[in-house]
Structure formats: structure tokens, C-alpha cells
């Protein structure tokens, strides 16, 4: 384990217990932690302090998929492309249409992970009608800064068990906990898609069209 004045080192846990052990040791040394998937959005925001980088890239794989129930669970490091391909094979999709910002932020193309999508609340233009990524998240498994493994939410929307911690983690960029698995809603693919382009509209009319 490096001390706090040295450059970042990369850790890639392949199991929850490995992640817990890593965070436990990091906490002893009081080092800052940067959480990434494949690092496609590392170019966004302020550069982190040198410390330890934890990548969830080795925590991958779909753990549950029930097309008839419109629900899927996947480990955080599962590539978004793999998730979307499996959904498409069953005529389904992610309704919030996460886009690929890798090239725009200096990262690689096609490198997003499903955990990274929810950790950053990455949502496309369909969020206006379908809601953002956080609105589709049903539950999550995560490890906090005390190396404690916890689960929040479940596989159904009506899951009244107190605070919705899973949705609180969405958009937190890994600053609250490291998500290791996410469960989310999926939707049927539309039979057809039409794109409309309007130009030269006044602001009030443009807003009206969006809503």
C-alpha cells in the first residue's frame, strides 16, 4: 500500500470480499479513493488527489435477467455494450438511453460500464419522457468507506423499506460507496423510431415541444 504522497495505484477486485479487504486496508492508511469502471469519464471534473484507484472492471456479468418481468441485475463492471446487446436480443432496451461520452471527455469509445452509468446518472435525450438512470434503478449492492457490504432496494418498484439509498448512490460518482451490482428496469424496444429536427424556434416554444 502506498502512502498519501505517492501517485495513484490501480486495484481491480474480482469479488465483493476482495473489495472489502482493499477498502479496509486503504482506510487504515487514510488514502483518498477514486472509483472507476473502465475510466471513460475520468476526463470530467476536477482531477482527484493521488491515492488509490479502484476499478470495478473485473466485477462483470449479468446475474439476473427476466425479460417477462422487465428487470435485469448485473455486476458493476459489466460493459454497457454487453447489457444493451442482451436486451436487444430480447426486443428490450434501457429507456433512459445512456450515451457514449468517452471520446468527448478524452476517454475511449464504448468503454462504459453499467455501474458507471448509474454512478454518474448518465442519461440521454429520452430522459425527458422516460426519466433518468436513477428513475430506473431498483436496487444496488455496494461497499461503503468502512468496508461494510450492504444492499439497498430490490427487484420491484414498491419496495418501502426506508431510505432509498440505491437511488442516492446514483449520480454520486463513487463518492458515497462502491456499487458492485445494480438491479434496474428495462423496457420493450419501440416498433419504430422517428427523429424530428426543429430549427429557429423561440425559447418558449422549444421548451413546450420538449414537454
Which residues are covered by each model-predicted region?
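N-terminal glycine-rich flavin-associated loop
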Residues: 2-35, 56-110, 118, 122-155, ...
